[in-house]
């Protein structure tokens, strides 16, 4: 019996069902589980503990692993990967080192429909959702290439995670419960989709465990006019409505919300705009990540000076807003926030 659905992403009980359906004893599922998630195999024929005849019959069963077609290293040590999927499409993932930690920035969609004005991914449009195994594979690929255990995952690559929420939650379940990455080390970023933050809050659980990962909302503006310019979809989703959903999320989950704010020189980096932002977030259980703009070819936005960034952060702190400045580490490899877009025209694809 064959099954075209990749095995990567399945839980141990699901693998037990699959193994038994193949006419094998159920204990083989534990072996398969270990080889999938601890040894990160690409083909079932690699499982030496399986009977040879069965291994040979399993060669056509898809595990769900991608192929690295290019890797670019930034001066800071971050590595951007171009990964070829089963259908020939290319996605991007980034490995980001920090001391003894390794963070993976993963994609949740092939392309993105949000078309944010400062982001490279949206310039290429939306092609399709990624399946759970295609998300999980990005983490295993980086972990395997670095020969280092992944400690953190950020859903800040290609795509809008909440528009592919079922697959994202399925991937997080596996990454947490099967691969052993703590939920508190996982961040899911969104520009804000009407009703979807509430839907996420009401989910409450990931698999059989409480929802504990971090929600990061890409706010990027202190008022509706600037947000409409930067994020076209926000024209149908007022900031007041977005923030109310975020407040509901905090109340339902007990988890604070992180707000991402990209600083663009001369547009949203003025002291008075810091005060507007502080007013928006007053009384909110939240944290603000300030991200100085990362340049991309198609837009004219510039990164503010360090003095301007520091002044903006100080203005927020004076208003009792918790804030962190995030200087991107992937600039030299076009792997920083806002720069991810799989470039199939320049990637060297092996025959």
Curated annotation (Swiss-Prot):
Binding of [4Fe-4S] cluster, residues: 112, 116, 119
A GO CC term attached to the entry: cytoplasm
Radical SAM core domain sequence ranges: 98-334
GO BP: any one term: rRNA base methylation
The record's free-text note on cofactor binding: Binds 1 [4Fe-4S] cluster. The cluster is coordinated with 3 cysteines and an exchangeable S-adenosyl-L-methionine.
Reaction(s) this enzyme catalyzes, per UniProt: adenosine(2503) in 23S rRNA + 2 reduced [2Fe-2S]-[ferredoxin] + 2 S-adenosyl-L-methionine = 2-methyladenosine(2503) in 23S rRNA + 5'-deoxyadenosine + L-methionine + 2 oxidized [2Fe-2S]-[ferredoxin] + S-adenosyl-L-homocysteine; adenosine(37) in tRNA + 2 reduced [2Fe-2S]-[ferredoxin] + 2 S-adenosyl-L-methionine = 2-methyladenosine(37) in tRNA + 5'-deoxyadenosine + L-methionine + 2 oxidized [2Fe-2S]-[ferredoxin] + S-adenosyl-L-homocysteine
Disulphide-bonded residues: 105-337
Cofactor: [4Fe-4S] cluster
Sorted UniProt keywords: 4Fe-4S, Cytoplasm, Disulfide bond, Iron, Iron-sulfur, Metal-binding, Methyltransferase, rRNA processing, S-adenosyl-L-methionine, Transferase, tRNA processing
Predominant location: cytoplasm
InterPro entries membership: Aldolase_TIM, Methyltransferase_A, RlmN_N, RNA_MTrfase_RlmN, rRNA_lsu_MTrfase_RlmN/Cfr, rSAM
UniProt-listed Enzyme Commission number(s): 2.1.1.192
GO molecular function: 4 iron, 4 sulfur cluster binding; metal ion binding; rRNA (adenine(2503)-C2-)-methyltransferase activity; rRNA binding; tRNA (adenine(37)-C2)-methyltransferase activity; tRNA binding
Other known facts: Reaction proceeds by a ping-pong mechanism involving intermediate methylation of a conserved cysteine residue.
Functional note: Specifically methylates position 2 of adenine 2503 in 23S rRNA and position 2 of adenine 37 in tRNAs.
Official protein name in the record: Probable dual-specificity RNA methyltransferase RlmN
Organism, scientific name: Synechococcus sp. (strain ATCC 27144 / PCC 6301 / SAUG 1402/1) (Anacystis nidulans)
Organism lineage: Bacteria, Bacillati, Cyanobacteriota, Cyanophyceae, Synechococcales
Gene of this entry: rlmN
């Amino acid at each position: 019996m064959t099954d075209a659905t990749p095995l990567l992403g399945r839980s141990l009980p699901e693998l037990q069902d699959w193994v038994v359906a193949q006419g094998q004893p159920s204990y083989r599922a534990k072996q398969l589980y270990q080889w999938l998630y601890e040894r990160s195999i690409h083909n079932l024929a690699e499982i030496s503990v399986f009977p040879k005849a069965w291994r040979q019959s399993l060669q056509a069963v898809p595990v769900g692993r991608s192929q690295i077609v290019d890797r670019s290293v930034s001066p800071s040590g971050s590595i951007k990967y171009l990964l070829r999927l089963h259908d020939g499409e290319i996605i991007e993932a980034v490995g980001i080192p920090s001391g003894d930690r390794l963070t993976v920035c993963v994609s949740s969609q092939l392309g993105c429909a949000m078309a944010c004005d400062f982001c490279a991914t949206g310039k290429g449009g939306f092609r399709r959702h990624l399946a759970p195994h295609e998300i999980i594979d990005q983490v295993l690929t980086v972990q395997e290439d670095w020969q280092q255990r992944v400690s953190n995952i950020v859903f800040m690559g290609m795509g809008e995670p909440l528009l592919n929420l079922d697959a994202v939650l399925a991937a997080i379940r596996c990454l947490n419960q099967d691969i052993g990455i703590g939920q508190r080390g996982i961040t899911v970023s969104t520009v804000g989709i009407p009703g979807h933050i509430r839907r996420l809050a009401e989910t409450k659980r990931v698999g059989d465990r409480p929802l504990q990962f971090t929600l990061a909302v890409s706010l990027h503006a202190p008022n509706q006019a600037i947000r409409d310019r930067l994020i076209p979809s926000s024209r149908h989703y007022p900031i007041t409505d977005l923030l109310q959903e975020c407040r509901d999320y905090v109340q339902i989950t007990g988890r604070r919300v992180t707000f991402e704010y990209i600083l663009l020189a001369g547009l949203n980096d003025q002291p008075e705009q810091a005060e507007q932002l502080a007013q928006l977030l007053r009384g909110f259980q939240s944290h603000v990540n300030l991200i100085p703009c990362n340049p991309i070819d198609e837009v004219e936005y510039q990164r503010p000076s360090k003095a301007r960034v520091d002044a903006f952060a100080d203005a927020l702190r004076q208003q009792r807003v918790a804030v962190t400045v995030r200087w991107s580490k992937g600039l030299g490899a076009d792997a920083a926030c806002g720069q991810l877009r799989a470039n199939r025209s320049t990637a060297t694809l092996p025959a």
